[in-house]
């Protein structure tokens, strides 16, 4: 039986229905707003796999080409591997729901969101976030929801819930907020130098906006009437737990205070191995349980130290930033490079400048578009002292790269002012927390090293949270272990003027406004400190670009002259590029970008293009070639494809009986344009050019009339 709930969400109607499609899934809903429809299903295995010790949640999001009335452009004409935007949406759905499953629920669980119809003004990503929660709510899968996501924009100081594409063009922020009844669960987005207070207002504007949608999910859950599965509480062997604590408590408390990541992990591994060996005979077959108890013990020791004494793993207090070292211009053949080191986290970041032909073509439900700024984040296994099989970037690398890309996009010059394609690659060389923020800091420095005229330097910092009851500690510049053992990972990037990007994930039920306000204020202090350290090495863009970077010169031609530049079958443009070695990009507007590392080659290409597109100007001198002799005058080619008539009366100051007395076909002759009629016919005069050089100066060595 189908159940339907309608709700107004940000001024637009949203319909959530269940019981009509995909009825063999544990939970399935169709979410519709405007002409956008998303089918979201939730399925969990009946039992957890034997020995399972983590929650295997998988989220898939697919935009079907037919949803936009298109046929896929791939060779096989069907949807292939997920695009980067689809991968990012998978993460967007996953992150807010993951902390809301019971801790001891370890069954394989899969959420699949399929966009089956799409229009431009109703974002399927937001509807998919809503659908994932709703599908879990109407299923028998245990879930501590509901939650919902909302996109928030701001135009002329007015906050907008789920803005349209046109509104986003004018907005100075685009953030996605996921929230429950009482708290914020996830935030991510970008902005143009928005203050901490304004960002906080936008986040909680989003929190208020999702409340009607949460009520609608609860109503749909009641209509569906599906009982939740029982999740038996975990069985704890109290005798084993007591023995583990007896043997390892003091040693673990000391181990978590070791500052070096590798030494600390080695000591914890040693404690684990020795404790397991000591208890092997007494508690045979319980090795996995012993390791779990030791993990809990590490968790408790780290958190207790921070909450009770304010001392962190590496001895810092809650606000201190790790030591920072920066270097710029260390790779001689690249266009821009920087090495950013913060504690045991290090990133080598490189900027490369290209032309519009290097832009990335992106295909979406709404058509093709091009990206001129790309940031790719790499996380090789050696950065954490491990080995693994590498097959392209994973979801985490794509997500971290996009966060850093958003952080830096706000400071880039406009395309008209700087017509380059920009690619930044961040190679994580060492990682002990905040590697994505190292990509932001190093990326900014590499842009400046490349001579990109950015509007302001940008830095990023990762904030953490440890919360037990009423005790709260907010941590600046968190370590990897503080991320793993803490309750929040809150990344904030921006300039001294405001925030350009942020991303927050939590592992608890949510965070309050007070916690977020303090975290944002503390993040600003840390960000300003990092910007100061970066400025000690490089505080502004270099005045000159690398000699290895292409120089792009922009010229304009009339749109009806574009075909003349290209030529039949591309003949002219091919001749220009082969002759000069430059790269030429022609836009439909008549804008032509010429890229070359050689000024001479660029000047020659401009001359050749001008020769193809210039039009005769009255009063201007031209050195032309006689193409045809007639009784009444001579036709002279003054520009490629442009002839003009020199009437017999304009050949000389004295009377000329026949044209051939003065000119013959193939002669080079200096002429002056004396007019262009309404039909484009050019009138030339040799007579008025006599006694002049081609540049218009008097030719003293040639008497008039010769």
Curated annotation (Swiss-Prot):
GO cellular component entries: cytosol
UniProt keyword annotations, A-Z: Cytoplasm, Magnesium, Metal-binding, Nucleotidyltransferase, RNA-binding, Transferase
Signal peptide range in chain numbering: none
EC number: 2.7.7.8
UniProt GO BP: mRNA catabolic process; RNA processing
Origin superkingdom: Bacteria
Enzyme class: transferase
Cofactor: Mg(2+)
Entry keyword Cytoplasm: yes
Residue numbers binding Mg(2+): 483, 489
Swiss-Prot/TrEMBL catalytic activity: RNA(n+1) + phosphate = RNA(n) + a ribonucleoside 5'-diphosphate
Location of the KH domain: 550-609
Main subcellular location: cytoplasm
Claim: Metal-binding is one of the keywords in the record: yes
Alphabetical list of InterPro entries matching this protein: ExoRNase_PH_dom1 (IPR001247), ExoRNase_PH_dom2 (IPR015847), ExoRNase_PH_dom2_sf (IPR036345), KH_dom (IPR004087), KH_dom_type_1 (IPR004088), KH_dom_type_1_sf (IPR036612), NA-bd_OB-fold (IPR012340), PNPase (IPR012162)
Cellular compartments annotated: Cytoplasm
Protein family (similarity comment): Belongs to the polyribonucleotide nucleotidyltransferase family.
Function, in words: Involved in mRNA degradation. Catalyzes the phosphorolysis of single-stranded polyribonucleotides processively in the 3'- to 5'-direction.
HAMAP family: PNPase (MF_01595)
The protein, known as: Polyribonucleotide nucleotidyltransferase
Gene name linked to the record: pnp
